[in-house]
């Protein structure tokens, strides 16, 4: 009795949406942009306390392939982001979104991982080399860069 | 017409060079004397092929390690044109199945040392790319850590209850099971390892199916515990782990491409394993090429992966092929020998360089390049704009571009003509079996006696291949040098010899074939001699730097 891939992804995403709506975590949230299309979501992440991103909110996009959850969603920062592991277009370098992906991960764990990445960048493989240098050298200047880059989310 | 005349000089016999040619030929003749016997044996000449035959002896050590075997070295007996010589290559031919069987033998051999199940050793070896030395080293240092690291053991404290243990690594049926992967609640078969991470059978199959083609160790979806081959087969319901092994071996061949090469011929699945690569630099230095032969008798160059390309070395071959690809659009167009008259469709063969064509049948005048009517082209040396545009696009100096194109066109046409002839000869080979059979039936000769036909065809094919690639060498050679002129003369001699032998092989009547048998021996022997001479002359051009690929 073979399960259709489309059916699998739909049921899975419906389940994830229900879990998120009932979640008590306030620092992250996500939902489909279009009620009729479960494969494209936007998510919101609050910067962790005691980091250069404290108090700031960031918007990301999540595009789910038909073979999700056996393959990871494509995630990008829609908000401008100054971070060693994020490039100018918002592309993210994070191992669990690539070779370390597992089908047991979900939207919540992904967003929480991104939130952790804000406070703990991986400076060994930076997409933004200047940010990687400043992180170690000058946190004050780093914070200034983050704020200079920051834009309030207008549809939150 | 003038360009034709200019090119003809390459093939013309120049009186002033006669002494050099005689000296060179005399040198070769003394090595390859043909006896005047009525039924002489075909002279066995040392050729590239004999150097690269697969070793018949089985090595005592049964391993696919790099550099673990002492390759038997035999000096090349051929006359040396410059310092040094190259040893015979020591290689073997394998298939993925053969490699896998060898891997299993190694696992069985190692099992008493490791004292763990064979399926576990298979995973350990897979992780260390079948480097047994490295594996044993790490195993000695940190045995338990290694098992945990590779997912063959768990630090979790699991109950040792016998009944509980029996539920792991088995497909079980569950009622009302909710799978956290597909979020479906249903009655379904499930699978789990000792870690207890349980998923429905469909999700596990989907997951494994994706992983089989990567060639990596497959783990639990939620932790690093490894699935063994038998686990994979249980989940999938049929022997799928062989696909994983295939992918693992392909990945292995890819990673070790200094020692392993896939046969480049279409649909051939052979892998050539070069045991000792230490002599390869010497091949390159002396402008030889490491030709090998797979189990299906496909011969190719281990270095660059192309077919056998003597007398060109890998550098010339690569440059020539690259140029051929770049120029192919123009050349396929320019080199068309015949076209239909646009008006009455009679086939017209182009002669000379003029693009102004007149159909001999209906007298229609048209342009050879664009096949349009000639009248709008006018006169006064007008060239077709299509051709002109191509030239303009190629270079800022149209005159130089045109000259380059003409030179290349000349050599490519010759290269291509012998490629086409080689295909025709291949078709000829298909009919040889019929002829040999007819010889046996009608005249009653033995199979052995009919072998001269097959041998002649083999010599013909090799001669054609060498002749074909010799035009690539000629293209990159300094045309003004004396040795290049000698090379061109050798080309002409081989071309004539090849055509002569090819003509002989067209004979259909078995009785006539047997009557003219001495001619087969003589002509095949001559082709073989001229082939060797051309190869050596070409190599000399390379060694002396007269032939070199411009960067």
Swiss-Prot record, chain A:
User: Broadest EC class?
Assistant: transferase
Please state the pathway this protein functions in, per its UniProt record: Protein modification; protein ubiquitination
Domain of life, per lineage: Eukaryota
MF-aspect GO terms: ATP binding; ubiquitin conjugating enzyme activity; ubiquitin-protein transferase activity
Question: What EC number(s) would the UniProt record show?
Answer: 2.3.2.23
One Pfam family here: UQ_con
Q: Name one GO biological process term.
A: protein monoubiquitination
The answer to whether keyword ATP-binding applies is yes
SUPFAM superfamilies in alphabetical order: UBC-like
Q: Give the record's keywords alphabetically.
A: ATP-binding, Nucleotide-binding, Transferase, Ubl conjugation pathway
GO cellular component terms, alphabetically, are: cytoplasm; nucleus
Q: Which residues form the UBC core domain?
A: 8-155
Catalytic residues of the enzyme = 93
Classification via InterPro entries:
Ub_conjugating_enzyme, UBQ-conjugat_E2_core, UBQ-conjugating_AS, UBQ-conjugating_enzyme/RWD
Reaction(s) catalyzed by this protein?
A: S-ubiquitinyl-[E1 ubiquitin-activating enzyme]-L-cysteine + [E2 ubiquitin-conjugating enzyme]-L-cysteine = [E1 ubiquitin-activating enzyme]-L-cysteine + S-ubiquitinyl-[E2 ubiquitin-conjugating enzyme]-L-cysteine
What family is reported? Belongs to the ubiquitin-conjugating enzyme family.
Q: What does this protein do?
A: Catalyzes the covalent attachment of ubiquitin to other proteins.
Please give the name of this protein: Ubiquitin-conjugating enzyme E2-18 kDa
Its taxonomic placement starts with: Eukaryota, Fungi, Dikarya, Ascomycota, Saccharomycotina
UniProtKB/Swiss-Prot annotation, chain B:
Does the record carry Zinc-finger as a key word?
yes
* CC annotations in GO: cytoplasm; ubiquitin ligase complex
Gene Ontology molecular functions: ubiquitin conjugating enzyme binding; ubiquitin protein ligase activity; zinc ion binding
Broad enzyme group: transferase
What's in the keyword line of the UniProt record?
Metal-binding, Repeat, Transferase, Ubl conjugation pathway, Zinc, Zinc-finger
For Zn(2+) 4, which residues are the binding ones? Answer: 367, 370, 377, 384
Residues engaged in binding Zn(2+) 1: 179, 182, 200, 203
- Annotated stretches, region: TRIAD supradomain: 175-388
Q: Where is the active site?
A: 354
SMART domains in the record: IBR, RING
Name the EC number(s): 2.3.2.31
Question: Part of which pathway?
Answer: Protein modification; protein ubiquitination
Residues the record lists as binding Zn(2+) 2: 301, 304, 309, 314
Copy the domain comment: Members of the RBR family are atypical E3 ligases. They interact with the E2 conjugating enzyme UBE2L3 and function like HECT-type E3 enzymes: they bind E2s via the first RING domain, but require an obligate trans-thiolation step during the ubiquitin transfer, requiring a conserved cysteine residue in the second RING domain.
Q: State the similarity comment.
A: Belongs to the RBR family.
How would you summarize the oligomeric state and partners of this protein?
A: Interacts with the E2 ubiquitin-conjugating enzyme UBC4 and histones H3 and H4.
What function does this protein fulfil?
Answer: Probable ubiquitin-protein ligase involved in the degradation-related ubiquitination of histones. Contributes to the post-translational regulation of histone protein levels by polyubiquitination of excess histones for subsequent degradation.
Q: What is this protein called?
A: E3 ubiquitin-protein ligase HEL1
